[in-house]
Amino acid sequence: MAGRHALVWLRADAPSQALTPGAQPRLQAWFAAGFPAVVARRDGAEQPGQVRLGVPLPPAQGKQRIALCAQVSDIARSVPALALPEVISHAPPQWQAALHALQAQATAIGMQPRVFGSFAFQAVTGLPYVHAASDVDLLWTLDTPTQAHAVVTLLQQWEHVTARRADGELLLPDGNAVNWREYAGDAQQVLVKRNDGCRLLPRTALFPERCAA
């Protein structure tokens, strides 16, 4: 099953029922336009064989986030969060230089971030989500604390130089994730996000193999 931040398209005949009150007409119009939903964190209310999804509407439609559950069997197609090069050409002109710099710097340290959130949905729908003050949401898949440190250093320097802001997560070897900015802090415990919830864990538990060595 696709993990959090993956984009999914439902079959044209798949039933969909908004869990967000009053949002059913907008949800139907969204899927009728051929747009995807994003896989969200499970909350325990899903039935067997279901996945929790979200549809974040653009600012022109109130930025409402519509929640729904769908049968896994009704998913026609799914893709991971988009690679950064896939979204750069769809970003506003004032973002282009900063994103190209981010891509070059990530390549230089051997990392390839993926993008979710407003930049991803602007890329896949063509609708205007991003503005000058937006954050770019990045997902970094990594295996070691050394990689995590390199990503944090890169992002801190990139924000300082470009005056842009990056949000997002470090995807840990076990498939869980932690906010990069929280990881960059000095707290002994960090909030770890899982597909089925969140919990506080000691920083030393994030890379257990290294700790055991």
Swiss-Prot record:
It catalyses: apo-[malonate decarboxylase ACP] + 2'-(5''-triphospho-alpha-D-ribosyl)-3'-dephospho-CoA = holo-[malonate decarboxylase ACP] + diphosphate. Keywords: Nucleotidyltransferase, Transferase. GO terms for molecular function: nucleotidyltransferase activity. Its EC number is 2.7.7.66. InterPro entries: Holo-ACP_synthase, MdcG_C, MdcG_N. The active site is at 135, 137. Pfam families: MdcG (PF10620), MdcG_N (PF20866). Transfers 2'-(5-triphosphoribosyl)-3'-dephosphocoenzyme-A to the apo-[acyl-carrier-protein] of the malonate decarboxylase to yield holo-[acyl-carrier-protein]. Belongs to the MdcG family. This is Phosphoribosyl-dephospho-CoA transferase.
